[in-house]
Amino acid sequence: PSTVEDSISVASINNKIITTEVFEVKGLEGNADVDNGKFDYSKSATDTDFEKGKEYEYVAVGLGKEEDFKDLDLTGKLALIQRGEIPFTEKIANALHHGAVGALVYNNVEGSNLGMAIDGDAKKIPSVFISKRYGEALKTGSYKVVFNNTMANRPSPEADQLSDFSSWGVTTDGQLKPDVTAPGGNIFSSLNDNTYGD
């Protein structure tokens, strides 16, 4: 129906900001270069979650290969792992087998956070994916990480781009459609069952 000449069809563009969960990094609260220590992330589907309010220590373990854990004590700590070379599942399982209680996987290139598809032993501990910038900031210091289910607004890397679910182009009779665009992607709003999401 929206391709009829006399209709006005509306395309969806992505919002300028995204509302996302963040964890806090104790010691980086005043550092504007890394969002004042509030790091956004994408969470993996795991059997457990990070303990709310607990201050976690972490250990940088390179790419998370078996040999990267040599002589490192991860007991009760998080593993800070760089993306690359081996699958996410293997990295996180290696961390678990060396005593880690969770994993922070950071990107090896600039860009949006990825969703990590993991299975097996890797699902036994909580894990999140963070940006290269955040990972490198953690790697260069010794901070504490706290998960408090806090939300924050961030600039969207896909701002003002057509949403992937929105159609656009030329109709079969050569008309340009849609006629106008409006924000419709990455809109944080109320959902069923007293929840929020986008």
Predicted segment positions?
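Structured lumen-facing ectodomains of secretory-pathway proteins
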Residues: 1-178, 182, 192
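Short pre-catalytic strand/loop immediately N-terminal to key active-site residues, enriched for Gly-Thr
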Residues: 194-198
